[in-house]
Amino acid sequence: MPMVQVFSIASILIWPIFLVFAVNFYKIHDKNKAEKFLAVYEKIKPKLATLLTLGLICLTYAGLVTIVLNSEMQEFIKLSENNNELVSVINNFVPMIGKLILLLLPLLMATWFSPMLIVYNHYSLFKSIKSSIAGCLMYIAPLGLSWLIFSTTAILFMLSCGVLIGSLASFFPSIGPSLMGAIIFFALLVITSVMFAFQYISYRDIFKSARSY
């Protein structure tokens, strides 16, 4: 468990840096350019401290959300362990997830564009956060619709993968666990890749008039 916690903390801290590397892949292909990894790193290097500070803000906010919902999470875990009625578990799960989404929404809006604005537009930390939130609010209808379509498609895709895993496991019990890991990894890779593409396209279209480097 301690190693998992350390990995989770490190992942949140470096997430803005990783996000810029990932989005840059779509940026260079969109502009038909070729850039080596070191060239991308040199572009990001002057902004590493700012990106890490953004990661620290994300970590702090996520920690506060965890504290706020900790009691409800603990109650849900106990309920799911001791209660075999699926309806009762779902009735407690849905409100908790609703609160989690509402609490994390400001963080999502603050960090949706800010890493790219820091690196490509040379915005300061707080200007990038403010501009990211403003961009999300100004285009909340198309972004919200796109997110709804993306989330629905991702859920259906994961459910389809679950059915595929169950079918393969019943036909090939000996290799079922290995296939399950490979299919889940592939599914998450596809979903994450599509999310990064959506993130780049929304950044490009919303901030197309802002000077970028």
Describe the role of every protein-language-model region.
Residues 1-213:
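Hydrophobic alpha-helical membrane segments
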